[in-house]
Amino acid sequence: MDDDNLDELVAHSPGPDGPPQVGSSELASDAEESSNGHSEDSEDDTGSEQDDDTDGEETEGLSEEEDPEDRSGSEDSEDGIEVPTAAVETQRKLEASSTPNSDDDAESCPICLNAFRDQAVGTPETCAHYFCLDCIIEWSRNANSCPVDRTIFKCICIRAQFNGKILKKIPVENTRACEDEEAEEEDPTFCEVCGRSDREDRLLLCDGCDAGYHMECLDPPLQEVPVDEWFCPECAVPGVDPTHDAAPVSDEEVSLLLADVVPTTSRLRPRVGRTRAIARTRQSERVRATVNRNRISSARRVQHVPRYLMSSLLDETIEAVATGLSTAVYQRPLTPRVPAKRKRKAGRRKKVLGRKKTRSRSSVKSKSGGTRAKKRQHRVRRTKGRKLKNEVTARSRIARTLGLRRPVRGTSMPSVYKPVDPSLGLMRADIGAASLSLFGDPYALDPFDSNGEQSADPPSPLSAKRRVLSRSALQSHQPVARPVAMGLARRQLPAVAPEPSVEEAPVPDLLGSILCGQSLLMMSSADVVIHRDGSLSAKRAAPVSLQRNSVTQSREESRLRDNLQPGALPSESVSGGLIGDRRPNSGLSCGDRTALRCLPAQIVQTPVRSDSSVTPRSGLSGNLSDESRPKWKHSNSPRLNGSNVRVGSASTKTMTHSNFPSKNIAPGHPQKTDPRRPDFSKLPRIPKIRRDGSNSTQDQAPASGQTVELPSACISRLTGREGPGQPGRGRADSEPSSRGPQETGSHTSGSRPPAPSSHGNLAPLGPSRGKGIGSSFESFRINIPGNTAHCSQLSSPGFCNTFRPVDSKVQRKENPSPLFSIKKPKQLKSEIYDPFDPTGSDSSPPSSSPESLGSGLLPSEITRTISINSPKAPAFQTVRCVTSYRVESVFGTEMDPDPQPPGEPVSGMLELLGKGPAEGASDLEQEGLGEIEPTEIQGSSARAQRPSPPDPWDDEDGVSCTPFFGSEERTVTCVTVEEPSVPSPDAPQITTHRIVEFRASSRSRSTSSSRSRKKTKKKKKVAREHQRTRSSTRSGSRDRTSRSVSPFTEEHTKRHRAKTKSRRSSSDRASSQDRAKRRKDRDREHRRGPWGHGRCWRKSRSRSGSPGSSSCERHESRRRKRRHSGSRSRGRDGSPHSSLERDRRHKHRERSRERMDKKESMTRSRERRRWRSRSPSVEHRTRRPHSREKHPHSPEKKGAVREVSPAPAPQGEPRQDGDHSTKPPVSEVSVLPEVVSVLPEVVVADLNPPEVPPVLAESVSCVPEDLDYGDSVEAGHVFEDFSNEAIFIQLDDMSSPPSPESTDSSPERDFLPNPILPPASLPQNSTLPVTQREVLPIHSEDISKPAPQPLAPSDQCLLRQDTVETTATTLSTPGVLPMGKDSPLLSGRGCEVVRPKDAVAPAPLLRSRTLVKRVTWNLQEAEASTPALDRDPRTPLQRPQRPQEGDWDAEDRALIGFQQAPFSELPPPIHVLQESGLPDADPSQPPGVPRAEGPPAVGTLHSAGGILAQVYSPNMPPPLAQPSSIPPYALVNQPSVQLILQGTLPLASCGAAQNLAPVPTMPATASELAVPTTNNSEERTATPKTAAEKTKKEEYMKKLHMQERAVEEVKLAIKPFYQKREVTKEEYKDILRKAVQKICHSKSGEINPVKVANLVKAYVDKYRHMRKHKKTEAGEEPPTQGAET
């Protein structure tokens, strides 16, 4: 009867489908044949609802057959029929009216413990206890007492839902007979005491051993059936439960029990800690088993659901589906249920070997096919049924072969299921049937033959579902079977579900797999391979990565794991390395199948260690990451390619620089990958990468490239930064970019740097650096954003790549030849490669070894550098402040990666110093140089050491230097990171400033790539610096603006910077001659430089005294600059040495651009401001337009800067004067991005007190960075990209410089008018502010120092003069300013603002800041100084420019952020204010001026002429007046800027800070912020900025907004052409500039998109035409046209 009963019950309701059975089958049968043999057949019927008609007939036959078969069949059948009929009718009603009450928390059936969902509910008539209809019916078959309270009931009330009204009452079946029969059939459970098996409702089952005990037979008889777990006397000890349970149970069951940690196997056991609703008695267990069987059989229909679908995530869904199929809706999937029934019957069949089984089979058959069912309706059906069951139809065979299963209920698509082929026990466990052991027959549910077994296997998936459905029921009631099933299913599911069971190693990482899948999906179809099984793998990475993955991935992954860990350990980014490397294997080439496989895990960890992990990925030469990683930290060479190939980089201190250390080593060397990873290295990956770009950056980094390629593409796509046309490149580039940013994260953490190094090793060297070189990545767009995670591992190269990829397009275009040799500087010098000339950039990146990573990383992820400076400053804790400053470094510097490293070790600043001249020094000098620079500068030993390439730091720094300094101009974004571990006496808390070098100008790529790209950018920067030497202030300002622009802006800026870089690349190309000249000049300078390492030194010099390199080097570089070219920085800045270059540039560009600059300076500044104001907004378009606009303006700004170039000349003179005081240095700083060099000279001059020079050096560093605003813009993009990452917060610090975007265009524009005039006076003022500003970020950690810093505020000169220490401190303080310290993370911009304030003693910092700000405003003229200022406090630069209304929005946003940060710092600013106030009035006094000018500078910035004039005369009043006019934007930003820029200048900063404090808390409008700031500024000094100024500003803002709109429209219109490469970046910028100008000057004052599109198209056609005739002409023409326009 058990079988019969079960069948009936199943049919009626007990089956998992029980209620559904009753509902579906019985309802169906009821409807069709209200009284067919519903008892047994209703189940069949239910089972085969689809065959309702046939089933109906079958049901009749079956009923007849079954009734005879099942002893209790007749009774049950009749009862069942009634019950089913009622149930069926009810079910129909239920189905019609049932609404899902599927709350797991909802009431649940005490029997099955399943929550009442939509299943029909039955309640005994005598009580209000609710049970699943099938459960209570099944229960009633055994006992007519309520399972809960044991009250006798004669009828079951059927309700549609819990608490639903009674739809019908069905009489309780006479279950006694059934029970007896069942007991006989089944191995009965006998009371251990009395030996009887009756009174099952009182026969308690031990939860431990399943032994039966009658309640009365227990020693103290139980009056109530225990609802909770009950253990027999023997199992009284819970610990024994599992054993006991296992003992009687089959081995499989035992295993299941063991698997089920919970010892109780009681099915009644509440799920999830819920107490049993009813006692676990033999009856309850029988009922539960029956219900379970029924449901399982139902579920079995669903069993074909792929096991992987059974995974936990799908559990709920499956549960819902299964529930619907089984108990939930009481609608048994007809077909599936029958098979389940069949199995169930088979199980019973074992017990009742008779017709029951046959019947079951027949029923199954009927279920199988309606037609067959009809045939089977007769006895034949019975026999046939059995056969059918075992019989394999063609369809079933095909389906089985294909793994197709009947669709899960609710789905119309057949589910694909790949049987796991588990043992019956496992299947049972999956199903949760293991608890059948309770019944004594573990195989009761598995009566089938092997065929049935197979079914069982599928059932297991279904079981999983069932389990999921009734997980509570199965788990609670049969924890043994169910939990095990769940566990097994899940365990198996992972193995089976993910078809790649082998791949399962990563452990199913849902998120990772999703991300990987997404990345694959995002990849261009060309890069994805669709396998027969439907799986996707990345084809692009496949060549290397995939190939390697396929062949060696498993092996390599394991090896990577092993290696990685070793490498990772050395790298400190074990996890990053481990996962990073292993994943880099797979994850990095996300496209790789393996990568995909690993990606899941990878991805999961990627977010955390995407920096590290991705880096290895990127350099899929995980070995490099693995082996190399441990090494490269210590040795740069290994970084190349995943192998420890020094890739010819050994000579290049920046082994990674040998992304191919030297471009010479181009692709071939990268293949030198670690012996371990010969696969990757030797893979043709590099060629592939190479094809990505003429610069075979990727080629060079075979592993890296490939990994980069795929992940880049994926990331690219995900980031959306990759141009459609450049999937491969963009991907590779993107990945590095992404890695770069991630590297930042890794670098940020002490351990991370190594990982990024490893990545840098792989991808950075290969792809990242290679990218820079090969510019094979077009993902400069994606540059830093999406791939940040991946790039992270690219660490040094990675970050370089990040920016470089931005550059890479241009590089690709212009640097087809792999200029990977470290000698790249020479190449750069001789070659006028694309502004993105990858050669320079790449050269530098390769030079920067993974150690150099820090420096290299920074470019890619501005913050990354800091973290990468792990060897020296492994303690890069957080990027406090990311300030970008433009550094003009001689390309020679690129080749000079070595010089810095020696000093680098000294400066825990790691790459910051490594970036030393360009970035490292900047960072270190800002943070470390400010603190450590004095040490380093004073103890030039660091710098002296720097020449030694071996030093890891040296390498890194050198690399930094190389990439950053390699670039002619590089916007060095100083990411201030608290770097407790920095060994710097002067900088107790050396906030490591990651100096992200964004190549200014065309090199705006991301700073991430900066290293790798920076070199590339360097070429661009060389040209740009040429441009920017003229328009350095402008460029720097622009870059700064970009950088300063809000974090979002920065992010976008990164993106845009990539674009901008492309554009700049074009303009740089246009000025390629200038650039080439400049490079040559720089190279000469560099060569002249005492250091043979033209790269680092040159960087350092280029970078204005190599502020970024290291303090010592900076000073030395400054001195050398002086020696060599009167000032290399000048040479770069257009100072003495760059005099020729500058003259050339000025002549070449100023002529064409002076007009353009003057005319467009305002327009561009407005446009840029507009863009910037937009850019601060998250709008990518806005930012992009900002960048683009910026870029188009860049040439103009460059022109303007060039105009200022004469100013730089004057500044150069001041530079010469710089020796005598800070003023000259300031002038120098102010002069240009090259001013960085100037500043170093100034510092050199100030170097007399070595400490002061450090400050200057820091300032210089800042200056270069800020100066490189073009880069800054791209840096902004980088930041933008970074914004996605934790680092981005730090980048937000840089974002404080996001203002740079605004400042960039504004200052440049504003300055353009009077840029040349103020340079001399402003530069001086600027210098101090610059220094201070740099200090701010540098000392962001040293908040405590701010108080000590008052000196600096009092007088920057003092800072330089009397306080090398103080200066260092002041610098440190500025660096430490809250901006650097807590703000950075808290609010990117706000942080920076705060840092400058707090870090710098309110007075000193603010004062410096003020100066800085003034410098910023003077940025165009005193670009060097301003960049320095901007660099440290990114906002300063931004703000200075922001004040130029165009930037106000972005500036405001940045300011708000900064202002928020400054709140805490307000008091110090006040202090500063007072101090500032004193010097403020004194325009002649550089320190005072900065203070006075800080606010005025802001104001002045708004009005170019006014600003310049004000800057000229640092009279507080005029500047303040301007701030008043500028308040909405400039003021708000300016206060922050002032806070940061005027870190030393208390007045401006203080007032700004104070006003800002309240405003910052709430993102007050720019005007609000500006107003308070203005007021403070006015308080500090007679605020010249009056209503007139404000009105003027408002008008300007209107124009700016219009310009922004115009820019947006133009960009939208030109975008397609640019994407199609119909226009070069330069042309893009020119067209953008011209079109915007034309649109803005249109009389209608309206912006008609159609007209804009036509205009743009006309321009595009014009340029195309011009290009045909003369490409160079076209390149130069844009500036001219811009000037004309």
Swiss-Prot record:
CDD domains: mRING-HC-C3HC3D_PHRF1, PHD_PHRF1. A zinc finger (RING-type) spans 109-150. One of its GO terms (molecular function) is protein domain specific binding. Residues 606-625, 637-662, 694-709, 737-751 have a biased composition (Polar residues). Residues 339-364, 372-387, 1011-1031, 1054-1064, 1089-1102, 1117-1129, 1181-1191 have a biased composition (Basic residues). SUPFAM superfamilies: FYVE/PHD zinc finger, RING/U-box. It comes from the Eukaryota. Residues 671-682, 1065-1075, 1130-1143, 1151-1165, 1192-1201, 1577-1591 have a biased composition (Basic and acidic residues). Residues 41-81, 922-934 have a biased composition (Acidic residues). PROSITE patterns: ZF_PHD_1 (PS01359), ZF_PHD_2 (PS50016), ZF_RING_1 (PS00518), ZF_RING_2 (PS50089). The modification Phosphoserine is found at residues 450, 460, 817, 848-849, 867, 870, 922, 948, 984, 1002, 1135, 1139, 1205, 1372, 1383. GO terms for biological process: mRNA processing; transcription by RNA polymerase II. Residues 835-860, 1001-1010, 1292-1305 have a biased composition (Low complexity). The modification Phosphothreonine is found at residues 335, 1416. Keywords: Coiled coil, Metal-binding, Phosphoprotein, Zinc, Zinc-finger. SMART domains: PHD (SM00249), RING (SM00184). InterPro entries: PHRF1/Atg35 (IPR047157), SCAF11-like_C (IPR057031), Zinc_finger_PHD-type_CS (IPR019786), Znf_FYVE_PHD (IPR011011), Znf_PHD (IPR001965), Znf_PHD-finger (IPR019787), Znf_RING (IPR001841), Znf_RING/FYVE/PHD (IPR013083). A zinc finger (PHD-type) spans 188-238. Residues 1-82, 333-390, 449-483, 537-590, 606-777, 809-860, 892-1229, 1290-1355, 1369-1390, 1421-1448, 1466-1501, 1569-1591 are annotated as: Disordered. Interacts with POLR2A (via the C-terminal domain). This is PHD and RING finger domain-containing protein 1. It comes from Rattus norvegicus (Rat). The gene is Phrf1.
